[in-house]
From Swiss-Prot:
Signal peptide: none annotated. The lineage of its organism: Bacteria, Pseudomonadati, Pseudomonadota, Betaproteobacteria, Burkholderiales. Its main location: cytoplasm. S-adenosyl-L-methionine binds at H23, L25, G50, E71, D92, N121. PROSITE patterns: RRNA_A_DIMETH, SAM_RNA_A_N6_MT. It is found in: Cytoplasm. Its EC number is 2.1.1.182. Specifically dimethylates two adjacent adenosines (A1518 and A1519) in the loop of a conserved hairpin near the 3'-end of 16S rRNA in the 30S particle. May play a critical role in biogenesis of 30S subunits. It comes from Verminephrobacter eiseniae (strain EF01-2). This is Ribosomal RNA small subunit methyltransferase A. One of its GO terms (cellular component) is cytosol. PANTHER family: DIMETHYLADENOSINE TRANSFERASE, DIMETHYLADENOSINE TRANSFERASE-RELATED.
Length: 284
């Protein structure tokens, strides 16, 4: 098995590209802790997003036997292809169909018929779009372990009532049970980012609430569009415009509403409109 160079030395030979948000993990203690948290087992179908200089890739593939990686950087993808046990997909991760990829990997012996495990040190400049992209593929994914900006992780796992609780919290908690695993300081990277990082574990709910994603996204976006105002001035206007007659207290701020209440509202509002109770468009 061809083994990449030790992380710190490898980072010194590659010029990080700012436009790709490249910060390479070099702290071996952190690498070991992440691998221990992931606990890869031989034969498991795993996909790593943004492998970079293979600091995490190498210990993972040693335990798995084979690993699929998604890398946008052409030079890094070329380097990774020298590794006999890596399947390299050079692509923008936002264009990757993870459901189709899971089906492909299931059909590749000796991989057993199971869901994907997805890991990665996500580029901080597009981490939220990646998380939302993966929402659509939750049924094909077993779990996710990501390195992210610490502030983003805190928003992901936030509970109602605090300033960190927002649109990201609601949308992700709808589909995942999440846990912040460890803090990663800037000095663990080359070059060091200007922010602290953290590792999060994301376990898709076996039976997420059956709601219309577009409806939920619209309601949550409206609710948090003006955080300081009561929902009566934002989401309440939408409900009034659609003549919604259900029970939902708009005398609160968006951050005070639990995830389950947003889910219930999305389900009821979608049914209300589908039943033809929505008023006709102007001029109809």
């Amino acid at each position: 098995m061809t083994r990449p160079a030790e992380p710190a030395r490898a980072a010194g030979r590659h010029r990080p590209r700012k436009r790709l948000g490249q910060h390479f993990l070099t702290d071996q203690r952190i690498i070991d802790a992440i691998v221990q948290a992931i606990a890869p087992q031989p034969g498991q179908p795993m996909v790593e997003i943004g492998p970079g200089l293979a600091a995490l890739t190498q210990p993972l593939v040693e335990r798995l036997g084979r690993l699929t990686v998604i890398e946008l950087d052409r030079d890094l993808a070329l380097r990774l292809r020298r590794h006999a046990h890596l399947q390299v997909i050079q692509a923008d991760v936002l264009r990757v169909d993870f459901t189709a990829l899971a089906q492909t990997l299931r059909a590749t012996p000796p991989t057993p018929p199971t869901r994907l495990r997805v890991v990665g040190n996500l580029p901080y400049n597009i981490s939220t779009p990646i998380l939302f992209h993966l929402l659509a593929h939750g049924s094909a994914i077993e779990d996710q372990h990501f390195m992210l900006q610490k502030q983003v992780v805190e928003r992901m796992v936030a509970k109602p009532g605090g300033s960190d609780y927002g649109r990201l919290s609601v949308m992700l908690q709808w589909r995942y049970a999440m846990e912040k695993l460890l803090h990663v300081p800037p000095a663990s990277f080359a070059p060091p980012p200007r922010v602290d990082s953290a590792v999060v574990r994301m376990l898709p709910h076996a039976q997420p609430a059956a709601v219309s994603r577009p409806m939920l996204e619209e309601l949550v976006q409206l609710a948090f569009s003006q955080r300081r105002k009561l929902l009566h001035h934002t989401l309440g206007r939408w409900l009034d415009a659609h003549q919604y007659a259900g029970r939902f207290d708009t005398r609160r701020r968006a951050e005070e509403v639990p995830v389950q209440e947003y889910l219930d509202l999305a389900r009821e509002a979608h049914r209300w409109i589908a039943d033809g109770k929505d008023p006709p468009c102007a001029g109809a």
